[in-house]
A protein has these predicted regions:
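Amphipathic alpha-helical "stalk" segments
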Residues: 1-140
Length: 140
């Protein structure tokens, strides 16, 4: 399916590029930049391959119209987080809330992903926001 192929080409590394540009002094961004310096070509190839698999999973959720509140979608977010933890930096509750706030206020993330794959631009930010509030509700 051509649409899913396009979605596979949207890698988490692209979101990382946006994040590192917007928050160059963030402690996690600094940590990730240090880790990235040591990656070999093989590491990069593996990271991209894993990101493609992740995006294929997310694309299937969109095609199947799976709501962000569904356990399959929540699993998609967990895969997203695991990818970041493995390749960039640890993701904790504070970071998830920061990412949720950033994606809800700054629409350039949604627009960026939407250009890459129809539906992904709205789905991923909504999924991040849902997961953040699942961890810590507004009134908690």
């Amino acid at each position: 399916m051509k649409w899913i192929k396009r979605a596979e080409d949207v890698t988490c590394a692209l979101l990382w590029k946006e994040w590192s540009t917007n928050f160059p002094e963030d402690r996690l961004v600094i940590l990730a930049k240090e880790r990235i310096k040591n990656y070999t070509r093989s590491d990069w190839d593996m990271m991209v391959e894993e990101a493609h698999a992740l995006n294929a999973y997310l694309a299937k959720l969109i095609v199947d119209k799976v709501p962000v509140t569904d356990p399959k979608a929540e699993h998609g977010f967990e895969l997203f987080a695991e990818h970041y933890i493995k390749w960039f930096f640890p993701i904790d509750e504070e970071y998830i809330h920061k990412l949720a706030l950033e994606t809800s206020i700054n629409k350039k993330y949604a627009l960026f992903f939407e250009k890459q794959a129809p539906g992904l631009g709205m789905y991923l930010p909504r999924l991040i926001i849902h997961y953040a509030y699942k961890l810590r509700p507004l009134n908690a």
